[in-house]
């Protein structure tokens, strides 16, 4: 789905394997591509089957399309927990990392910033770009929950982790973003901003150990702020598992991206 400047929806296209190889090891991709039965890749969180390769290619390709066109990729499976060599935390392919590498390799984009507001830290994305000063990774997440990474100060010079206490809501969430993420992105001056848009910090989510109280307005405001940080912005869906609220939250984020784009322009 495209951002409001291009208010039409379309089906994504599967990624080429070469795009995935910019992020993931050939051995892991071979394993995923040749599964013939349900197999635990990350017990007890991530199982894959003979159809998972097709789904993973489509998710990654849709993320690439979104990055190219300034869109919002509504995909499953999500991706931000997947490191280069394996699956993890429901994630098979790191969609946002694949999109970032594609834009650098195929479209000459230099600096890419990735802002991740999923309630869980995106350990996979952090790992992919740990030694790459052309990509800034900034994560706003609840402290002390899965996957146990993302401590304050963890990572290199182009990593910004903002762990938040359980129970915080819109005001603390937005303040942390304003204080820590916005200045880091502004200093980095990205040509492209990719958003790992997870909605599982919402007050109506019911996930083990998650205790956040972000509202629809909180997601709208964070999306608005993200859209004002770079000349080109795209988003990829990460977490968010309450099917009764997810469409509403995506709509709120799209509203925010639209108003942020207008402000930036």
Predicted regions and their residues:
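HDAC/HDAC-like amidohydrolase catalytic core signature
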Residues: 1-115, 120-265
């Amino acid at each position: 789905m495209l951002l409001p400047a291009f208010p039409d929806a379309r089906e994504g296209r599967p990624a080429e394997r070469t795009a995935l190889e910019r992020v993931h090891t050939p051995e892991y991709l071979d394993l995923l591509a040749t599964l013939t039965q349900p197999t635990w890749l990350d017990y007890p969180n991530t199982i894959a089957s003979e159809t998972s390769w097709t789904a993973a290619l489509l998710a990654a390709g849709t993320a690439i399309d979104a990055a190219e066109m300034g869109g919002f990729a509504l995909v499953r499976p999500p991706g931000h927990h997947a490191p280069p060599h394996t699956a993890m935390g429901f994630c098979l392919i790191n969609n946002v990392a694949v999109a970032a590498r594609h834009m650098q390799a195929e479209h000459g984009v230099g600096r890419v910033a990735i802002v991740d507001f999923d309630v869980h830290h995106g350990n996979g994305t952090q790992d992919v770009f740990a030694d790459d000063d052309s990509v800034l990774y900034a994560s706003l997440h609840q402290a002390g929950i899965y996957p146990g990474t993302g401590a304050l100060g963890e990572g290199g010079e182009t990593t910004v982790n903002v762990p938040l206490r359980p129970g915080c809501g819109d005001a603390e969430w937005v303040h942390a973003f304003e204080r820590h993420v916005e200045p880091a992105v502004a200093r980095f001056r990205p040509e492209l901003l990719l958003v790992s848009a997870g909605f599982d910090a919402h007050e109506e989510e019911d996930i083990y150990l998650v205790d956040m109280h972000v509202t629809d307005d909180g997601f709208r405001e964070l999306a608005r702020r993200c859209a004002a940080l770079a000349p080109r912005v795209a988003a990829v869906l990460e977490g968010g598992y309450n099917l009764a609220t997810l469409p509403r939250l995506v709509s709120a984020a799209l509203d925010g991206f639209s108003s942020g784009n207008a402000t930036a322009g």
